Each structure stands twice: as structure tokens, then as C-alpha cells.
A protein has these predicted regions:
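Short beta-strand edge segments in extracellular beta-sheet folds
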Residues: 281-283
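N-terminal non-catalytic cap/leader segment that marks the start of a structured domain
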Residues: 1-104, 108, 201-204, 212, ...
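Glycine-enriched loop-and-adjacent helix/strand subsegments that border the catalytic/binding cleft
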Residues: 71, 77-233, 242
Length: 283
């Protein structure tokens, strides 16, 4: 199923241009006693919610996708994890382009590991990103994101896919400069996720998810997860060796070659045959 959040925490199932409002399926969620749980309650209970959502589809109100405001499909990730330079072609361009490396040494993912983005950077499809005034430049980085469905620590790659709740498109927006990576990657709107959470049955082979990015209609990035240096199971193993992964945690798997700057007025579109279309505007 393709789940979306829309119009302030309503739950929808996406079929083409229609959204079926199945918000009542959230009645299956347990009561949260604290102000904020440590994980995303919707993702933690996704299997139960999906059963209720299927039962509601026949009678659910239908809305046109153009008439709703989509939010990031995950509301409360405890962590947004990024995988730097996880495509060989991007590693090559990052080492060669001063605009990307800004004079700093570029390390392969096996040397530098992963990084964290602030949860406050999270936005969904249709968002407007405001460029920070102190950035040397801001670049687009199209990615496939993995959404964790089951808690785990020290997860072996051979067991990793059983922990996956679904997949989404992502933009790991990045400001260039001398500041620490976490500062440059955590500006408001710099973690774009959407348009939906596609459950594993929607993806034929997560090792072969094709995706591309355009800016104002010009193709800048096009790749496939088969070209990842560290595969999705290997990334889950790597991350869980350092962090407990919780339901709703987002792992952005890395961006391919073609990273480039964006400017005020640009429209960025990330497209995947299986994961849909993710659009943001730059202000």
C-alpha cells in the first residue's frame, strides 16, 4: 500500500490521483502516555493499521491529490540518518568539484560512516524550501529513503530487510561551507520525504529502485539503488551497530552523481516508477 499523511495528520491510501481517507484506521494505535513517544506510533503499528485501512477502502471518502496538502509520511522519526558518498560516481565528482568539497577531504562511506539530520528539517511533498542566507551554495541530493518498522540494535545484513516498514523518495538538501556537516544539512526543509510510504509489497526489488531528479525540467540526476556502494541491508547493519533503530527512523541511502546548486525560484522534482513523484519549490 502507498500511505500518505495529509491535511494535518490525516491518513490516506494513494491510488493514482486519488487519496482514500482512512484516518479511522489510526484508532488501532495504542494510547501514548507521554507527550512524545520515542518512535513513530503509526509506523510501529503499520501492520495493524494496514489491515484496518484495507477494510475501510470501499467506504472511505475520496479526494483528489491536487486538493490536499501532503506532509512527510513519517511524522516522528527519532533519527534521520544520512549515508554520505554512497555511489562511486558521486564519490568521484565530490573529490573533483571544489564547489562540493569546499577544500575538505572527501572520505568514502566506509571511512566516515553515516551522519544525522535534525528532525526539525523534515518536510513533505509540495513544500517550499528557503535557502539559508549564509550558505556558500545549496545543492540538491536525490535519494531513496528506507523507513524502519521494527526496533533493533546490531542487526545483521541478512536480517535487515525484516526490519523495513517501507520506502520513500527523499531530498537530502545540503548547504556548502565550512560549518559542521550536521549544521549544513539540518536547515529547515532540508530533509524532504515523500510523497508516500510505500510498503515493501509495492517495491519489486529494493536493490533495483530507479529514480531521477530534475530542476526546472532539466535532468540532473538519474540512477538506481543497484549502484549503491553500501546496499540497503548493509546500511541497516552499519547504522544499527551505532544506534538502536526505532520504528519511523529514516535512512537516506545516498545520492548519485549529478549533485548541483539550486536557486530561488527553482522547482525540484524527484521521480521513481515505484515510489512516485516528489516536488519542492525553492524560495
Amino acid at each position: 500500500m502507498q500511505f500518505c499523511r495529509f491535511n494535518v495528520d490525516r491518513l490516506g491510501v494513494v491510488h493514482g490521483d486519488e487519496i482514500f481517507d482512512v484516518t479511522d484506521a489510526l484508532d488501532t494505535l495504542p494510547d501514548v502516555k507521554w507527550v512524545r513517544s520515542l518512535h513513530d506510533p503509526f509506523v510501529a503499528a503499520l501492520d495493524q493499521v494496514a489491515v484496518k485501512a484495507r477494510a475501510l477502502l470501499a467506504s472511505a471518502p475520496r479526494l483528489n491529490r491536487n486538493d490536499v496538502v501532503l506532509e512527510a509520511p513519517v511524522a516522528l522519526p527519532s533519527k534521520i540518518i544520512g549515508a554520505p558518498v554512497n555511489y562511486h560516481a558521486h564519490l568521484d565528482e565530490a573529490q573533483d568539484d571544489h564547489g562540493l568539497h569546499q577544500g575538505a577531504k572527501v572520505h568514502p562511506i566506509d571511512e566516515i560512516g553515516c551522519f544525522l539530520k535534525a528532525g526539525s528539517a523534515l518536510v513533505g511533498d509540495g513544500a517550499t524550501i528557503t535557502l539559508p542566507k549564509d550558505a556558500a551554495r545549496v545543492d540538491h541530493e536525490a535519494e531513496v529513503a528506507v523507513i524502519i518498522g521494527k526496533a533493533g540494535r546490531d542487526i545483521a545484513a541478512s536480517d535487515a530487510m525484516a526490519c523495513v516498514a517501507g520506502y520513500s523518495l527523499a531530498l537530502d538538501m545540503t548547504a556548502r561551507g565550512k560549518q559542521d556537516r550536521s549544521m549544513r544539512k539540518s536547515c529547515d526543509g532540508f530533509a524532504v520525504l515523500g510523497p508516500t510510504l510505500a510498503t515493501p509489497d509495492e517495491v519489486a526489488d529494493p536493490a533495483h529502485i530507479a529514480f531521477s531528479l530534475t530542476v526546472n525540467g532539466e535532468v540532473r540526476q538519474a540512477s538506481d539503488t543497484s549502484l549503491l556502494i553500501r546496499s540497503i541491508p548493509e546500511l541497516i547493519e552499519m547504522c544499527s551497530a551505532f544506534y538502536s533503530l526505532l520504528p519511523g527512523d529514516v535512512i537516506m541511502t545516498g545520492t548519485p552523481a549529478g549533485v548541483g546548486p539550486v536557486s530561488t525560484g527553482d522547482t525540484i522534482v524527484v521521480t521513481s516508477p515505484e515510489l512516485g513523484v516528489l516536488t519542492v519549490n525553492v524560495a
